[in-house]
């Protein structure tokens, strides 16, 4: 009898405690998943601290080749941010942020890469929305052009120049994430 009564008291307590632990764990895993990935955790911690830029591709090219590579790089970056979600998830924000930092390091022209990394230390990527990302990209592009004595890029009509995708995708993307995923799956045939 006494054992049965103890079980009656302990069992609800254990259930409540396990529920609280489950809630806490699910919230903490969503917010601080980077704790388990030190290579990702270290990137934001280094922002704005004057870290030394990494020059992966130090090869010197002639001006024409440099211009072609840098133009292609910026077309890619502008296309990526122009097609970025209006309301990105936390994962999408982290992915874009790390992509922009990594692409600055792997930029094919070493001189431009170093200057871009210095700018990113002062002005880290803004990934809260498509508008924030496109505005940030245009401003950073113009800052780099100014440092490298290149003409500034016009930010007018920026989104329209680089947007890709069907109108259905663009409309549903503004609504919510589940519809966006459904439309993406409908628009593409993955059968090969």
From Swiss-Prot:
Annotated GO MF terms: flavin adenine dinucleotide binding; flavin-dependent sulfhydryl oxidase activity
Bilayer topology term: Single-pass type III membrane protein
Main location: endoplasmic reticulum
ERV/ALR sulfhydryl oxidase domain location: 61-162
Cited Gene3D superfamilies: ERV/ALR sulfhydryl oxidase domain
Intracellular or extracellular location(s): Endoplasmic reticulum membrane; Cytoplasm; Nucleus
Residue numbers on the Lumenal membrane side: 30-192
Protein name (Swiss-Prot/TrEMBL): FAD-linked sulfhydryl oxidase erv2
Gene: erv2
